Amino acid sequence: MKRVLTALAAALPFAAHAADAISGAVERQPTNWQAIIMFLIFVVFTLGITYWASKRVRSRSDYYTAGGNITGFQNGLAIAGDYMSAASFLGISALVFTSGYDGLIYSLGFLVGWPIILFLIAERLRNLGRYTFADVASYRLKQGPIRILSACGSLVVVALYLIAQMVGAGKLIELLFGLNYHIAVVLVGVLMMMYVLFGGMLATTWVQIIKAVLLLFGASFMAFMVMKHVGFSFNNLFTEAMAVHPKGTAIMSPGGLVQDPISALSLGLGLIFGTAGLPHILMRFFTVSDAREARKSVFYATGFMGYFYILTFIIGFGAIMLVGANPAYKDAAGALIGGNNMAAVHLANAVGGNLFLGFISAVAFATILAVVAGLTLAGASAVSHDLYANVFRKGATEREELKVSKITVLVLDVIAIILGVLFENQNIAFMVGLAFAIAASCNFPIILLSMYWSKLTTRGAMLGGWLGLLTAVVLMILGPTIWVQILGHEKAIFPYEYPALFSISVAFLGIWFFSATDNSAEGNREREQFRAQFIRSQTGFGVQQGRAH
């Protein structure tokens, strides 16, 4: 059982360690002109793509889903680009650099949620939905209440994730490029706005694809050079790393980072089910033509991400060997210059010189841009499509809906920049964990049960969904991170760091209880409509494909 809990603790990197890769203290570096030039090349190229995409965005379908004309392979790359963050690249390699084998367990944890998406969600989601996951959740339930709940769940997740990314972006750019924090945050905000405002999903998709290719190429080159150094022998790699690491052979033993099994289980469940409830990831399944391409998307994305996280393990051990043992990368106190999160960046310099260092720094920045662009589009679609067009202004024209979407992009952008500046010196690592917990406690139960449970009713979905969302937020506030570290109280009311285990349970129990006890005529009608929904979800009959999507 202990080993199972240890494996489930794989969620830790994203919600804590990896998030902390770009939220902890940073030491500003000298201006890196190679990195700045390479980043400018990336920006000019992607802005060119945005201009090209803007000429092809003529309808609501084009803006939200790129007309449904993205292939499974392209979408798989874009999903990988949307999901592989700078935090995972720098944070996981730093975790391997400091803790060895535990980093592998943690890096593989990023993949745990994807089989659920592949086998349970991707096909039915594409067959039932159109632009957002709320289309699926409200297929046979009452449109208004369900869309409001889904939009609120999406916006809270997007806001928390976006703040974490913006603060992380500012600190990472300060770290890598030597630019001022506030300039960095504004720069990310402006570029994010331009990609989404003018190019919609088509530009966002290609930015994510390019970023994924660059990141995979950079990580592959680093791993290749590390393995070349040890004669392509993993035995030599591990032997040399153990010889120079302060912990010695202990870096090859698991379990050093897992203390509390309840927190480990809670965090593991948060990542597993949270991944399947992230709105910017779910939105990507509507960019392909049919369910077959949706399945292929997940298959390719999982392959790309699995390959990448294995590379981070090699990069981390390479950093132990080539960076940790090299005094040139240490300060006077013997600590790594810029902190442990610079391990992968220093390794880039060690294996490829200053030019490759510039390339990796630029890729890290590109990584952030790709993630925030996807988040912004997901947030804008929740407001314009779910709330405006289907709740507050039913019958709105496509033009009106797109106008609201673009206004929302501007508002989200300004809010993200302001909050990025305000949260500069705050601990933002908990925000990513809370985003996953809310996605797992609100979005995921409603999506899953709306597609699979015939007895679900609007009353059950509403009460259970809101209970899950509020439980996650309240328990997070009462937990050690916010109640003690941020608010300064002596002892936490809720003893565990992450609430997913409890909030997911509350959500599922609430949905089950309030649906099972719903004997209204409306509830019975919704149950009767499940068969028609089931046939549509299995066959795709009635789904519009391609540009008319």
Swiss-Prot record:
<feature type="transmembrane region" description="Helical">
    <location>
        <begin position="404"/>
        <end position="423"/>
    </location>
</feature>
<feature type="transmembrane region" description="Helical">
    <location>
        <begin position="362"/>
        <end position="384"/>
    </location>
</feature>
<keyword id="KW-0915">Sodium</keyword>
<feature type="topological domain" description="Periplasmic">
    <location>
        <begin position="424"/>
        <end position="427"/>
    </location>
</feature>
<feature type="transmembrane region" description="Helical">
    <location>
        <begin position="146"/>
        <end position="168"/>
    </location>
</feature>
<feature type="transmembrane region" description="Helical">
    <location>
        <begin position="494"/>
        <end position="516"/>
    </location>
</feature>
<feature type="topological domain" description="Cytoplasmic">
    <location>
        <begin position="517"/>
        <end position="549"/>
    </location>
</feature>
<feature type="topological domain" description="Cytoplasmic">
    <location>
        <begin position="451"/>
        <end position="461"/>
    </location>
</feature>
<keyword id="KW-0812">Transmembrane</keyword>
<feature type="transmembrane region" description="Helical">
    <location>
        <begin position="103"/>
        <end position="125"/>
    </location>
</feature>
<feature type="transmembrane region" description="Helical">
    <location>
        <begin position="462"/>
        <end position="484"/>
    </location>
</feature>
<feature type="topological domain" description="Periplasmic">
    <location>
        <begin position="235"/>
        <end position="260"/>
    </location>
</feature>
<feature type="topological domain" description="Periplasmic">
    <location>
        <begin position="99"/>
        <end position="102"/>
    </location>
</feature>
<comment type="function">
    <text>Transports acetate.</text>
</comment>
<keyword id="KW-0472">Membrane</keyword>
<comment type="similarity">
    <text>Belongs to the sodium:solute symporter (SSF) (TC 2.A.21) family.</text>
</comment>
<keyword id="KW-1133">Transmembrane helix</keyword>
<feature type="transmembrane region" description="Helical">
    <location>
        <begin position="183"/>
        <end position="205"/>
    </location>
</feature>
<feature type="transmembrane region" description="Helical">
    <location>
        <begin position="33"/>
        <end position="55"/>
    </location>
</feature>
<keyword id="KW-0406">Ion transport</keyword>
<dbReference type="Pfam" id="PF00474">
    <property type="entry name" value="SSF"/>
</dbReference>
<feature type="topological domain" description="Periplasmic">
    <location>
        <begin position="326"/>
        <end position="361"/>
    </location>
</feature>
<feature type="transmembrane region" description="Helical">
    <location>
        <begin position="261"/>
        <end position="283"/>
    </location>
</feature>
<dbReference type="InterPro" id="IPR038377">
    <property type="entry name" value="Na/Glc_symporter_sf"/>
</dbReference>
<dbReference type="GO" id="GO:0006847">
    <property type="term" value="P:plasma membrane acetate transport"/>
</dbReference>
<dbReference type="InterPro" id="IPR018212">
    <property type="entry name" value="Na/solute_symporter_CS"/>
</dbReference>
<keyword id="KW-0739">Sodium transport</keyword>
<protein>
    <recommendedName>
        <fullName>Cation/acetate symporter ActP</fullName>
    </recommendedName>
</protein>
<feature type="topological domain" description="Cytoplasmic">
    <location>
        <begin position="206"/>
        <end position="211"/>
    </location>
</feature>
<dbReference type="GO" id="GO:0005886">
    <property type="term" value="C:plasma membrane"/>
</dbReference>
<keyword id="KW-0997">Cell inner membrane</keyword>
<dbReference type="GO" id="GO:0015293">
    <property type="term" value="F:symporter activity"/>
</dbReference>
<feature type="topological domain" description="Cytoplasmic">
    <location>
        <begin position="56"/>
        <end position="75"/>
    </location>
</feature>
<keyword id="KW-1003">Cell membrane</keyword>
<feature type="topological domain" description="Cytoplasmic">
    <location>
        <begin position="126"/>
        <end position="145"/>
    </location>
</feature>
<feature type="topological domain" description="Periplasmic">
    <location>
        <begin position="1"/>
        <end position="32"/>
    </location>
</feature>
<feature type="transmembrane region" description="Helical">
    <location>
        <begin position="428"/>
        <end position="450"/>
    </location>
</feature>
<feature type="topological domain" description="Cytoplasmic">
    <location>
        <begin position="385"/>
        <end position="403"/>
    </location>
</feature>
<dbReference type="InterPro" id="IPR014083">
    <property type="entry name" value="Cation/Ac_symporter_ActP"/>
</dbReference>
<dbReference type="GO" id="GO:0015123">
    <property type="term" value="F:acetate transmembrane transporter activity"/>
</dbReference>
<keyword id="KW-0813">Transport</keyword>
<feature type="transmembrane region" description="Helical">
    <location>
        <begin position="76"/>
        <end position="98"/>
    </location>
</feature>
